[in-house]
Amino acid sequence: MAAGGRQRRRGRFVGLAVALVAATACMVEPVGRPGEPTGQREPAAPSAEVTRADGTDTVEEFQEDVEVARRTAERYWAAQFEASGTTLRPIRQVIAYQRDGEVSCGGQEVPRNNAVYCTVSDFIAYDINWSFGAFRQVGDAFVYYLIGHEYAHGIQTRLGVQYNFTIQQELQADCMAGAYLGGAVEAGWLTLDEGDLDEFREGLLAVGDDPGQPWFAEGSHGTPEQRAEAFFRGYERSLSACGLG
């Protein structure tokens, strides 16, 4: 995946996707009064210990993809809001962190090996070492999915979307992430390399809740099949398929 035709070597959207992408689909609903995020505002330097099989992707490429994914998500949602006669208030901040407790959301510490959207302070936070490791072993598709899913949670908050069960919120965010990526590709803001969609599908089928987890349990995100179906429903049929209206 690339911005404006920038060609990139494709990474496999498998392997770490099982352990890593599943954890990205989290929206912090913190306890306590709203507060400013604590922690680093500028991206920290990721560990150099993580290596990718082909050794092609660098810290600079990772940081560039994070920024392109953020700008593209903002551009996509601004266009959707404008088409509805209103103006998007962009998500205030995207924060990289490295340690447990380095970032907090409404008094709740954000753990390592995670990515979240904080509703009370309006920011996305991601563990940079964990994310960079996934980027190098899974590929840049991981970054665009991660940012797309968490940005979708920010849009849900702006629209006042609320559900009785976590799984409903999460599957809708998967659909919205698919709509954002599909819309960005259709508009020419992003380009897909051959096989990227197959990698998205394989990766999404590799994530999901454990077979024994009840669908109604707090924190449920959906089965692998449900998550893949939601993402590609949004990708193929656009935002109208995501149940926002």
Please give the residue ranges for each predicted region.
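Active-site recognition of the HExxH zinc-binding catalytic motif
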Residues: W77, Y145-R158, D174, G178
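Pan-zinc metallopeptidase signature
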Residues: G212-G245
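Catalytic zinc-binding patch centered on the HExxH motif and its immediate surroundings
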Residues: R99-A125
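Catalytic Zn2+-binding segment of zinc metalloproteases
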Residues: Y151-I167, Y180-V185
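A metal-dependent hydrolase signature that marks the N-terminal structural subdomain at the beginning
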Residues: A2-G4, V14-G15, A22, C26-C105, ...
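Short helix/loop segments within enzyme catalytic domains
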Residues: E67-R70, Q80-E82, G178-D210
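Active-site metal-coordination segments of metallo-dependent hydrolases
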Residues: T56, E60-Q63, V161-C175
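Short pre-active-site segment immediately N-terminal to the catalytic Zn-binding motif
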Residues: I128-Y145, V161-I167
